[in-house]
Amino acid sequence: MNTIAKLGAFNVWANETLLRRLDSSVAAGKTAPQPALHIFSHVINAQAIWIARLSGTASPLKVWQEHDLPGLHHWHEQTSDRLRLLCEQTDEAELARHIQYTNSQGDAFDSQVSDILTHAVMHASYHRGQVATKMREGGLEPVNSDFITYCRELSGQVNPQQ
């Protein structure tokens, strides 16, 4: 598996692992901290925005649009696997292609597809770390969503997190 494809699969795993922890916490009678939901909403929204930019379509979501837990599940299902497929199925010519787009502040940019796909996963990882902090501050035990943890689970060296 090439690196970008592995990063796409990791991103799905990390989002699903985080959602499972939020679900189990809520099922145990705890409240999902709003700041954690706010930041994780941004993660999911950014995926939708990058997918739209890569496909030349309008994004269905805004950068800081907020979702409740069921909404996060819905948009994760709509975006995470699509991003994984882009990472997995994009050939060398497409990875080298440049796209022009406008960011949320209206600034125009030109970026290579390989850089965008890498950024999308790194951006999500950065913010999942912030979500973990907000979960801990809200009395929940966060998950370890590090890339190496994904690799260890994938190889059977550690058990999946609950």
Language model features with spans:
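Absolute protein N-terminus
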Residues: 1-3
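Short, contiguous alpha-helical
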Residues: 5-64, 104-162
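Helix-adjacent hinge/juxtasegments
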Residues: 58-97
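Mid-chain, well-packed structural core segment of small domains
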Residues: 87-103, 108-113
